[in-house]
Amino acid sequence: MFKGSCVALITPFTEDGVNYEELRKLLEWHIKNHTDAILVCGTTGEGSTMTLEEKKEVIKFSVEVVNKRVPVIAGTGTNNTKASIELSKYAEEVGADMVLIITPYYNKTSQKGLYAHFNAINDAINIPIMLYNVPSRTGMNITPLMLDKLADLNNVVAIKEASGDLSQVAKMAELCGDRIAIYSGNDDQIVPILSLGGAGVVSVLANILPEETHNICEKYFLGEVIESRNLQLKYLSLANSLFIETNPIPVKTAMNLMNFNCGPLRLPLCEMEDSNLVILEENLKANGLIK
């Protein structure tokens, strides 16, 4: 387990594959700038448009480069239980510290089916599982009562909670906060979720402000709550600008503007609208990230 900021890392692409030279640079940059954990092949990493072999290679490569300096979390969840198990087993074999398992999407199931999905994955592997709840993308919600049940599975140790519903997070904390670590899945709710006993954030913002996102959490844990809140608010407009279009379109655009060689988005994701690009650039300039 970790406390603090986990970057939901973008995947740098070339026109025909993954840019491993740039990926290595990003991994080293995050460690240098105090990122507390690194998630690869998640939503922000465009995992849904990567081939199985690309995912496997990115997970293996990242584990080798990071070399236990911080935890590496592998995004291995799909809407196919068998496929999720296969990739999760691979992540375990190559040394990932944890897997992130999203709720099934498109072929939405019942709460009973949701439990069966996570239970099957839990029984197939022997490394920690972080659940991922993002109903706006999947059409499915892990309810507090369901999380209370899932928290009894031996490998389920955490949840990335991106419902945006603080009342739901509070109920989760009440029911099973002593058995499962709750991480904010939204950069605009880091401090509110920390105040409910949260363990940190799985962050898009950390792609461009790794140390600052780490500091939001670190100051809170040190009891410097006002300073933590002030940092949350200082970067609020910038964080929101990263969602002016579908994530990860803005953050990958931002990183290329910041002279990282992150390459293109993969269809169906596409370039930003000009009007939104102006807003993103204004926020990057206001925070000294571009000239």
UniProtKB/Swiss-Prot annotation:
Pyruvate binds at residues 44, 202. It comes from Clostridium perfringens (strain ATCC 13124 / DSM 756 / JCM 1290 / NCIMB 6125 / NCTC 8237 / Type A). This is 4-hydroxy-tetrahydrodipicolinate synthase. It is an enzyme of class 4 (lyase). Gene3D superfamilies: Aldolase class I. Its EC number is 4.3.3.7. Catalyzes the condensation of (S)-aspartate-beta-semialdehyde [(S)-ASA] and pyruvate to 4-hydroxy-tetrahydrodipicolinate (HTPA). It catalyses: L-aspartate 4-semialdehyde + pyruvate = (2S,4S)-4-hydroxy-2,3,4,5-tetrahydrodipicolinate + H2O + H(+). GO terms for cellular component: cytosol. The gene is dapA. Pfam families: DHDPS.
